[in-house]
A protein has these predicted regions:
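Acidic, low-complexity cytosolic segments
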Residues: 1-172, 176-202
Length: 202
């Protein structure tokens, strides 16, 4: 599971086509590609991210698959989209959560006027931290972390319950047999119980 790119994008207005689409901040994690492929891959992912950012409605969250990649986009308002580009195995819930988190944090740091008036990339170092942290979605997302722990506990509990059921089945078969036993057998059980308790005392 990999996060390849995080992009904060100001999409152009569809009606006026102004201001032009601008990548405000970008972080890449392309170590899984060869050195010679990285610039082409980054360029393709940037194009992919800007394209889906422009075509996402305000307030919408969605995932778009392109070959081996998925672009998860959240467009918080007309001037801001966040795109998380991952491989297909990456959990959708975590990617959407990350896009939403980045969007909120970016909007706290930059005003609408700063976003609208930007003419080039802006400094947002948190993006590098997020791309490093979210490489392991189970550690980054507390819900997934708790879910994994619950799954592990559930597996242990299933084994324990299965063991109890096996014993329970044996006890049930004994109970069934005891319903078939006569009073004479019950007296034998009581006598044996007394004898065993007598022997334990000695």
């Amino acid at each position: 599971m990999k996060v390849f790119q995080l992009a904060i994008i100001r999409p152009q207005d569809r009606e006026t086509a102004q201001p032009p689409t601008l990548v405000l901040s970008l972080a890449n994690q392309l170590d899984s590609f060869s050195f010679f492929q990285r610039s082409s891959v980054e360029e393709f992912m940037r194009f992919f991210a800007t394209t889906i950012a422009e075509r996402t409605e305000v307030g919408q969250r969605q995932g778009i698959t392109q070959e081996n990649y998925v672009g998860y986009v959240y467009r918080s308002h007309a001037r801001l989209s966040v795109v998380v580009v991952t491989d297909k195995e990456y959990p959708e819930m975590v990617a959407i959560e990350l896009a939403t988190k980045i969007s909120r944090e970016f909007e706290q740091q930059f005003s609408d006027a700063q976003i609208s008036g930007a003419t080039g990339p802006v400094s947002f170092p948190a993006l590098q931290d997020y791309i490093a942290k979210y490489q392991d979605p189970h550690q980054a997302n507390t819900i997934l972390k708790v879910q994994r722990e619950l799954d592990e506990t559930k597996a242990v509990l299933h084994k324990t319950i299965e063991g109890v059921l096996e014993r329970g089945e044996k006890l049930d078969s004994l109970v069934d047999r005891s319903n078939e036993l006569s009073n004479q057998s019950k007296m034998f059980y009581k006598t044996a119980k007394k004898t065993n308790s007598c022997c334990i005392v000695m």
